[in-house]
C-alpha cells in the first residue's frame, strides 16, 4: 500500500516532488520535440545559436571564435539579397540564355533571314579623312603664321634697338667732326658730290631689288652679334677716312671704299628652324615671306645721310652698307651650296637603299631543268594549308582534270623534278601567273572596265528604256556591263575524267576513248605505270598516317587509336595493370562497347578498387575508370579477375565497323557462301499458284495390283466405288495450289 502511495504520489506530484515531476515531464515533452540539451545551451548563450550571428552572414564566420558580432552592416545578408524574389536565379538565367543561343545557332540559315536596311547617311570614310586632314593643315598653317609674325616682330624690335645705338654713336662722331671742322674747315668738291649722288642712287636701286627677296638668315641671326664686327669696321673706316689736314689748302677726297670682309660672322647655320612642334625651312627654296626686314634700317640710314652729307661720315656709312650687302650675298651662296649638297646626299642614299629585285623565273639557266608545261594552275586557295587548283598527270593522275593539291606536295614534287629551293618563290609566282604576289596596276584595270558616260549608252544596255539612276545607285550600270563583258572569261570547259577498269590489283586506266588519237604503246604503258605508282604512293601515305596515329595513341594512352575495332579480355587486363602501376595517370577511358562489354569493364574496375562511370550517349557510350583512396590501400582481387578472364574473350567496338578483310578472316565470307549454296546441283521444285496437284499424272496401268483387285470386286472405269445403290462420286476431288493470303472466293483460275 505504501508502495502504491509512493507510486501515486510520484505520479500526481504532491508538494516539491510533484512539481519536480511535472517539470521533468515538460522537459521530456520538449525532448521529444527537439531535445532540451540544445535549448538549455542556447539559453545559456543568450538565445543565440553557435555560428549564427545577428546578420546571418556565413561569409563572416570565424571557425575558431564563432560569429563576428561587432560588424556594422545592414539587416539583409548577401544570401538573402541574392534570392531576388519573383525572378529567376542567375544560374537559371544563364542556362536559359545558353538554351536560346543553342537553339538559335542550331536553326538552318533559311530560318534566319538577313535583312538589309538602307542607311540614312552615306558613310564615306575617304571624305571624312579628307575633312580631318584639311582641318589639321589649316591649324598648322595658322600656327606657323603666328610663329612667323611673332618672330618677325621680335627681329624688328631688336633691329630698332641696334639702330638707336647706332644713331647714338653717329651723333657722338658728328659732334667730334663738328669740333674738328670748327677748327679747320674743309671745302667740298663738286666732283665728290656727283659721285656721292650716283652711289646713293645705285644703293637705292640695289635696296629695292634686295627687298623683294626673302632673307630667312636675318630672322635667325641676331643683330647683337653683328655689332662687334660693325664697330670694328667703323673704327677701321674712321682710321682710314678721318684725318686732320694741317695745311690750309683744300683737298679733294674721293669716297673711301672698304674691301669686303671674307671672314663671315661666327654664326651657326641650321637649314631647319624648330619652334615647338613647328619646323621652318630657312633655305631659299622654302621661303614664303615677301617683305624684307632690313629695309627700314636702310631707309633710316638714307634719311640720315641727308642731314650729315656735309661731313665725311657719309662716305663711311656708304662703305659700311656695301660691305653688309656683300656679306649677305656670300652667306646666301653658302646656304644654297649646302642645300645642294644635302639634296645630292639624300639622292645618293635613296639610290643606295634600293633593294635588289628577284629575277623572274625562266631567265636563269637552272630554271630549264624542269618542264614547266607539265603543271597548270588556275586558282589558289589560302588557309592553314595553301592549295593550288592544278592539273598535272603525275600529281592528279589525269591530263584534263583539275584538282586541289597542297602546297607541300607541290613543292616536294617540283623539287624532286629539278627546281631549286632558292627559286621556289619565283617559280610559284610564275605558275600562278602573279596570283600570289600580284602587283596592282590601276591603269590597266581602268582600261578593262567599261564606263558609260552618257544616257544614250545606258539606253542601249537596257534595250532603249533606261531606268532613272539615283545618286546612290551610281555605277551599278557599269558593274552590270562589266559582268556581261567578262562572262566569257568565266565559262568553264566541259571535261571528263579518265575512267578506270578492273578491281583491286588489276585496276588500271581506261584509255579506249583515246583510241582516235592513235597513242603509241610506249605512251600507254607510261600512263599505266604512272597511275600504278600514284596508287602505291597513296596507299603508302595512308599506311604511314595510320602508323603515326597508332604511335600517337600509344604515347598518349589513347585506347581509341590503339584498339580501332576489337578488344580482347587480356588486353583489358593489361590496360588495368598499366593504369594501376602508373602514378602519373588518374583516369582511363575505354572505347565504346556493347552493354555486356561495359558491364565487364565495370566488374574489372571494381576488382582493381577503382571507380567506374558511364559517359556519352547512344553507340558512343563508354566507361571511364578513375583512381580514388581505396585504390592505394587495397590490392586487386586477382581471384575474381581470373574468373572474368575465363568468360567472354572478345569485345567488338560498337562505334566502328570492322574492315572486310578482318571479318572475312574470322567469320568467313558470307557472300561467297550464299553463291555456293545457290550454285549447288538440283533445284527446289517450284509450283505456281492455281496448279492442280496430280493433274498431269498418267493413268494407273492394268498391270497394277490395286486396279486388278478393284476390277475383281466389280469396279468399272468411269464409275464410283461402292455397292449398288451406295456408290461414291465418279469424278475425283481436285487439289489446287494456294500461296496468296486472300480467301478461297477471291481466287480465280
From Swiss-Prot:
Organism name: Meyerozyma guilliermondii (strain ATCC 6260 / CBS 566 / DSM 6381 / JCM 1539 / NBRC 10279 / NRRL Y-324) (Yeast)
Cross-referenced Pfam families: G-patch (PF01585)
Compositional bias annotation for Basic residues: 1-10
PANTHER family from the UniProt entry: G PATCH DOMAIN CONTAINING PROTEIN 2
Major localization class: cytoplasm
Protein name stated in the entry: Protein SQS1
GO CC aspect terms: cytoplasm; nucleus
Ranges of biased composition (kind: Acidic residues): 225-237, 303-315
Amino acid at each position: 500500500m505504501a508502495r502504491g502511495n509512493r507510486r501515486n504520489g510520484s505520479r500526481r506530484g504532491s508538494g516539491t516532488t510533484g512539481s519536480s515531476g511535472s517539470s521533468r515531464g515538460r522537459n521530456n515533452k520538449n525532448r521529444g520535440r527537439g531535445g532540451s540539451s540544445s535549448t538549455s545551451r542556447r539559453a545559456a548563450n543568450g538565445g543565440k545559436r553557435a555560428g549564427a550571428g545577428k546578420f546571418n552572414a556565413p561569409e563572416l564566420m570565424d571557425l575558431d571564435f564563432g560569429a563576428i558580432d561587432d560588424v556594422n552592416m545592414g539587416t539583409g545578408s548577401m544570401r538573402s539579397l541574392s534570392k531576388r524574389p519573383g525572378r529567376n536565379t542567375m544560374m537559371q538565367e544563364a542556362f536559359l540564355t545558353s538554351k536560346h543561343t543553342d537553339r538559335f545557332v542550331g536553326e538552318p540559315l533559311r530560318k534566319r533571314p538577313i535583312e538589309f536596311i538602307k542607311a540614312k547617311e552615306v558613310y564615306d570614310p575617304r571624305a571624312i579623312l579628307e575633312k580631318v586632314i584639311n582641318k589639321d593643315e589649316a591649324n598648322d598653317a595658322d600656327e606657323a603664321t603666328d610663329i612667323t609674325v611673332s618672330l618677325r616682330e621680335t627681329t624688328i624690335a631688336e633691329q630698332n634697338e641696334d639702330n638707336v645705338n647706332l644713331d647714338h654713336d653717329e651723333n657722338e662722331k658728328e659732334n667730334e667732326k663738328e669740333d674738328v671742322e670748327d677748327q679747320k674747315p674743309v671745302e667740298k668738291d663738286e666732283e665728290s658730290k656727283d659721285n656721292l649722288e650716283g652711289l646713293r642712287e645705285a644703293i637705292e636701286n640695289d635696296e629695292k631689288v634686295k627687298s623683294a627677296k626673302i632673307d630667312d638668315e636675318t630672322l635667325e641671326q641676331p643683330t647683337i652679334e653683328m655689332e662687334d664686327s660693325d664697330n670694328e669696321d667703323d673704327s677701321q673706316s674712321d682710321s682710314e677716312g678721318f684725318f686732320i689736314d694741317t695745311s690750309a689748302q683744300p683737298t679733294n677726297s674721293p669716297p673711301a671704299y672698304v674691301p669686303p670682309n671674307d671672314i663671315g660672322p661666327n654664326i651657326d647655320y641650321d637649314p631647319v628652324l624648330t619652334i615647338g612642334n613647328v619646323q621652318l625651312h630657312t633655305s631659299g627654296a622654302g621661303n614664303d615671306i615677301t617683305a624684307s626686314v632690313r629695309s627700314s634700317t636702310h631707309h633710316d640710314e638714307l634719311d640720315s645721310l641727308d642731314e650729315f652729307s656735309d661731313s665725311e661720315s657719309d662716305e663711311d656709312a656708304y662703305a659700311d652698307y656695301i660691305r653688309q650687302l656683300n656679306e649677305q650675298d656670300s652667306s646666301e651662296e653658302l646656304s644654297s651650296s649646302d642645300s645642294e649638297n644635302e639634296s645630292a646626299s639624300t639622292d645618293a642614299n635613296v639610290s643606295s637603299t634600293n633593294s635588289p629585285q628577284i629575277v623572274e623565273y625562266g631567265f636563269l639557266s637552272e630554271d630549264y631543268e624542269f618542264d614547266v608545261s607539265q603543271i597548270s594552275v588556275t586558282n589558289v586557295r589560302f588557309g592553314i594549308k595553301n592549295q593550288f587548283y592544278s592539273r598535272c598527270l603525275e600529281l592528279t593522275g589525269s591530263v584534263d582534270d583539275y584538282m586541289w593539291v597542297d602546297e607541300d606536295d607541290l613543292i616536294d614534287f617540283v623539287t624532286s623534278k629539278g627546281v631549286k629551293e632558292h627559286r621556289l618563290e619565283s617559280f610559284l609566282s610564275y605558275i600562278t601567273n602573279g596570283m600570289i604576289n600580284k602587283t596592282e596596276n590601276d591603269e590597266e584595270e581602268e582600261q578593262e572596265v567599261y564606263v558609260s558616260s552618257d544616257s544614250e549608252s545606258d539606253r542601249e544596255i537596257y534595250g532603249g528604256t533606261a531606268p532613272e539612276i539615283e545618286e546612290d545607285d551610281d555605277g551599278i550600270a557599269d558593274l552590270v556591263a562589266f559582268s556581261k563583258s567578262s562572262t566569257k572569261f568565266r565559262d568553264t570547259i566541259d571535261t571528263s575524267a579518265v575512267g578506270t577498269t578492273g578491281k583491286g590489283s588489276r585496276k588500271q586506266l581506261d584509255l579506249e576513248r583515246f583510241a582516235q588519237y592513235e597513242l603509241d604503246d610506249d605512251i600507254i604503258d607510261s600512263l599505266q605505270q604512272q597511275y600504278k605508282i600514284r596508287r602505291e604512293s597513296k596507299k603508302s601515305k595512308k599506311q604511314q598516317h595510320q602508323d603515326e596515329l597508332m604511335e600517337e595513341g600509344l604515347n598518349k594512352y589513347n585506347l581509341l587509336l590503339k584498339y580501332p575495332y576489337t578488344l580482347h579480355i587480356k588486353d583489358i587486363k593489361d590496360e588495368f595493370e598499366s593504369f594501376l602501376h602508373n602514378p602519373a595517370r588518374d583516369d582511363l577511358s575505354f572505347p565504346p562497347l556493347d552493354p555486356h562489354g561495359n558491364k565487364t569493364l565495370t566488374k574489372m574496375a571494381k576488382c582493381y578498387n577503382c571507380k567506374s562511370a558511364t559517359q556519352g550517349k547512344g553507340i558512343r557510350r563508354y566507361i571511364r575508370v578513375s583512381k580514388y583512396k581505396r585504390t592505394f590501400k587495397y590490392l586487386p582481387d586477382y581471384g575474381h579477375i581470373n574468373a572474368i578472364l575465363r568468360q567472354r574473350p572478345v569485345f567488338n567496338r560498337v562505334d566502328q565497323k570492322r574492315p572486310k578483310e578482318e571479318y572475312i578472316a574470322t567469320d568467313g565470307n558470307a557472300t561467297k557462301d550464299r553463291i555456293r549454296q545457290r550454285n549447288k546441283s538440283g533445284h527446289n521444285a517450284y509450283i505456281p499458284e492455281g496448279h492442280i496437284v496430280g493433274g498431269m499424272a498418267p493413268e494407273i496401268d492394268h498391270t497394277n495390283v490395286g486396279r486388278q483387285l478393284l476390277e475383281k470386286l466389280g469396279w468399272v472405269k468411269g464409275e464410283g466405288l461402292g455397292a449398288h445403290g451406295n456408290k461414291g462420286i465418279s469424278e475425283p476431288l481436285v487439289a489446287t495450289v494456294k500461296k496468296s493470303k486472300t480467301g478461297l472466293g477471291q481466287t480465280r483460275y
